[in-house]
Regions:
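Loop-to-transmembrane boundary segments
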Residues: 158-183, 280-281, 386-398, 457-478
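Short alpha-helical packing/oligomerization segments
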Residues: 29-33, 408-450
């Protein structure tokens, strides 16, 4: 009926808020406080070099006061209070949403998890996974707190590390768990969620140990019991969430500092609870949990053996004790001189520990202008074949061309509705694995640090898996989106 014939006019219809909007409104002050905590830990970590310079190997409180405070907050308030422990199930859901259908209301339904993931994504690409895993993960903080308390109670003599050779093997287990869950999720998300009980987070924080059957409680108790004697065992060897964050950590913009002498000095490696420093003094940022102990030693004139040696020499000769420069060495007494004379002969001949692997620069990237650099960069991402690869592994390269053609045909079949989404994902996954092999035989390099710089280094297997996996995930998501925009039902 027209408005003029209705007594009192047409009634105003008030549309109710969406469920996620009501959640955000009802918890607004807690959300604001949670966001403030995330900003605070990021700012504190951004000033890590100032804090580590204020610390020594005997007094780490300028760093630990903040770190322990955030552990307490993450355990007591974020974990047990807000029940906002991030989980691998959210990573799997994100993969599915990216490939099939992105629904904002799904991710906005839990504001704390939503904000936590914004924090995680930003900081992983800035610093690596260590800020979340080492400072803000509720379960990780719980493990480390138990380890520290046990140490303070006199159990230090029983605490140990897994022998390095076994650690270097066992650390791959968490990646296997992650890839297994990811593969299962592509065929059955329900089954993947059940298998994700390999995470003790739900039992610990969401449901409670006393509210679940005994196998779940026993699993949590076993992990926390082992944590008394081994630092963060779950984080280092089992956690699929940590593995999923470790892979993009390969491309973090800012890493922890190393100096040339680190390749022959083992002081930092001995004290590294994450066992993330190798025999050459290089830090594996996929494994590093950012305790910052090595950064404290980096400028500690009494704790760092190379600095202590130089300090004693200067004191004996009555020379000035200058401050420590950004390169980790004493600033030269005479400005015109170099710090190179402070580097031991053994260290000078060894590998450069400032990068995770040996630096390199592809020949075709040398001395080119911006336009040429841009097209070469694009070609590097899309075209994995190389002259070096053809020379060393011609059969592998030819087979790769055949598989690439097959993958292209598979996408074409998907475009006309002749191939299911599961089949195209299987094809794309197979091609991605083969692309790793092709690149390792020729274009064996990845970037270290910001993507717009030409800081290349030799790629290890996990470096290449991380690079190809992340790149092809984005390409696959873009192709799925294009097919959907064309009206193709997948």
């Amino acid at each position: 009926l027209p408005d003029n014939v209705l007594e009192g006019g047409r009634p105003k219809v008030v549309e109710p808020d969406a469920p996620w909007v009501r959640v955000w409104k009802n918890q607004s002050w807690q959300i604001a406080l949670f966001a403030l905590v995330l900003v605070a830990v990021t700012v504190v970590y951004a000033f890590r070099e100032k804090l580590t310079r204020l610390s020594t190997h005997k007094n780490k409180w300028p760093v630990n006061a903040f770190k322990y405070s955030f552990w307490a907050i993450s355990m007591a308030w974020i974990g047990f209070g807000l029940m906002a422990q991030p989980s691998i199930t959210q990573v799997l859901t994100w993969f599915h949403a990216l490939l099939f259908q992105w629904t904002w209301s799904l991710f906005l339904s839990d504001p704390f998890i939503f904000l936590f993931w914004i924090f995680i994504i930003v900081t992983v690409f800035l610093f690596g996974r260590g800020l979340f895993c080492g400072w803000m993960c509720p379960f990780g903080s719980l493990q480390e707190t138990i380890f520290k308390i046990a140490k303070a109670l006199g159990l230090k003599r029983f605490q140990t590390q897994v022998p390095q050779k076994w650690h270097d093997r066992l650390k791959w287990l968490k990646y296997a768990v992650f890839f297994f869950l990811l593969t299962v999720s592509m065929f059955s998300m329900g089954l993947a969620e059940k298998l994700s009980e390999v995470e003790p987070f739900k039992t610990t924080f969401l449901v409670g140990v006393m509210n679940r059957s005994w196998p779940y409680g026993l699993f949590v108790a076993a992990i926390l019991g082992v944590s008394i004697f081994i630092e963060r065992p779950y984080c280092k060897y089992i956690c699929p969430l940590g593995a999923s964050l470790a892979m993009p950590s390969t491309f973090r913009w800012f890493g922890l500092k190393r100096k040339q002498d680190c390749n022959s000095c083992k002081a930092c490696a001995v004290g590294c609870g994450a066992q993330a420093i190798d025999a050459d003094g290089r830090i594996d940022h996929r494994e590093c949990l950012h305790c910052l102990d090595c950064m404290i030693l980096y400028t500690d004139t009494k704790g760092c053996p190379p600095l202590a040696k130089e300090r004693k020499r200067r004191e004996k000769d009555g020379l000035e004790i200058t401050p420590i420069g950004v390169n980790g060495y004493f600033i030269p007494i005479h400005p015109a001189t170099s710090h190179a004379d402070q580097i031991s002969a053994k260290a000078a001949k060894g590998p450069d520990p400032r990068m995770p692997t040996d630096p390199t620069l592809p020949a075709h990237k040398r001395g080119v202008g911006f336009v040429a650099w841009f097209f070469l960069e694009l070609r590097d991402h899309i075209w994995p074949w190389s002259t070096e690869g053809w020379r060393s592994q011609r059969a592998l390269q030819v087979a790769g061309l055949s598989l690439a053609v097959a993958a292209t045909v598979a996408w074409g079949m998907a475009a006309v509705g002749s191939l299911s989404s599961s089949a195209i994902i299987a094809w794309w996954f197979g091609w991605s694995l083969y692309e790793v092999l092709i690149r390792l035989s020729g274009r064996r390099y990845v970037k270290d640090g910001p993507w717009w710089r030409d800081h290349y280094r030799v790629a290890g297997v996990m470096d290449m898996l991380s690079y190809v996996g992340f790149k092809n995930l984005l390409i696959g998501a873009a192709l799925f989106l294009a097919l959907k925009s064309m009206g193709v039902s997948l």
